[in-house]
């Protein structure tokens, strides 16, 4: 995990993106083994100290966006396909109209961040 995301959100997707870039295409929870996150309980209590919540999302999402050029939601939706049933190796994202509309939103957000932050 990257220290830049500590503490808080973004470290899991960052690790997944690193694995994706290395060619890993199987991302699956194994049987009943699960990681349960308690909805940012720790970081919410320390929010003002560690995080700045902005109109572009939390700090972890902003770091991920600046580092990879896409946000966590886009990565999970179009690359990891988190809301779908596991069917083996993942392929490159399906570049349809929804992909490009979502990508446009992400790039506009990135432009905004670079311009004003």
Regions found by a protein language model. Give the residues of each.
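Positions that flank functional sites
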Residues: 34-35, 80
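A short, conserved alpha-helix in the catalytic core of glycosyltransferases
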Residues: 4-34
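Short, polar/flexible loop-turn hinges at active-site or ligand-entry regions and domain interfaces
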Residues: 1-2, 50
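C-terminal, non-catalytic tails of nucleotide-sugar-dependent glycosyltransferases
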Residues: 26-27, 42-117
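Residues at helix-coil transition
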Residues: 1, 21, 66-69
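Conserved active-site-proximal loop/helix segments of enzymes involved in bacterial cell-wall
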Residues: 38
């Amino acid at each position: 995990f990257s220290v830049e995301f500590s503490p808080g959100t973004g470290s899991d997707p960052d690790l997944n993106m690193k694995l994706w870039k290395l060619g890993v295409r199987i991302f699956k929870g194994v049987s009943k083994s699960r990681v349960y996150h308690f909805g940012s309980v720790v970081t919410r209590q320390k929010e003002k100290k560690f995080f700045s919540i902005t109109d572009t999302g939390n700090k972890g999402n902003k770091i991920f966006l600046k580092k990879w050029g896409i946000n966590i939601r886009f990565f999970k939706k179009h690359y990891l396909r988190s809301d779908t049933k596991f069917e083996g190796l993942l392929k490159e994202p399906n570049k349809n109209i929804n992909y490009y509309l979502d990508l446009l939103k992400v790039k506009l957000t990135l432009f905004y961040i670079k311009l004003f932050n």
